[in-house]
């Protein structure tokens, strides 16, 4: 099972509830960094937050009481197949490092209209694998006013 298909959130439940509460009050930051050792559940946590945000106002929405994604939810199916139009996933799974061209995709992605008036989300897995040019490009994007 991959982080994008993990139905149950097994760790960071209190942190998740804090972010949900911020979202409910429209105070969720527009940039979040999850840092920690490999294998502790950061990606799973991120995908749960993404599924929560995308599944609001949809049938079979995120189950906050049990910290579970409903596998019948439309957004979950799109996210788990990496086909959600409001999600850009950048990862280094097929390469040694993340190249600057992948980071520049963020600019193209963010310039497009949002699908269903939902938030657009960029998830960079293994951000430590960016080369120096990619790091500089990301820094420039993050420094831009949003």
For every predicted segment, state its role.
Residues 111, 136-146:
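Conserved catalytic/switch belt of AAA+ P-loop NTPases
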Residues 127:
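Conserved binding/catalytic microenvironments
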Residues 131-133:
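Conserved D-loop-proximal element of ABC-family nucleotide-binding domains
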Residues 1-124:
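P-loop/Walker A NTP-binding region and its immediately flanking N-terminal helices
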């Amino acid at each position: 099972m991959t982080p994008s298909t993990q139905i149950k959130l097994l760790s960071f439940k209190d942190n998740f509830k804090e972010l949900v509460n911020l979202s409910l009050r429209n105070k969720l930051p527009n940039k979040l960094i999850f840092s920690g050792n490999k294998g502790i559940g950061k990606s799973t946590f991120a995908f749960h937050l993404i599924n929560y945000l995308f599944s609001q106002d949809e049938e079979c929405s995120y189950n906050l009481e049990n910290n579970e994604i409903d596998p019948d939810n439309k957004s979950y199916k799109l996210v788990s197949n990496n086909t959600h139009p409001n999600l850009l996933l950048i990862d280094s799974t097929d390469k040694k490092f993340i190249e600057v061209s992948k980071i520049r995709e963020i600019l193209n992605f963010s310039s497009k209209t949002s699908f269903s008036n939902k938030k657009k989300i960029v998830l960079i897995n293994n951000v430590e694998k960016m080369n120096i040019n990619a790091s500089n490009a990301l820094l420039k994007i993050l420094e831009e006013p949003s």
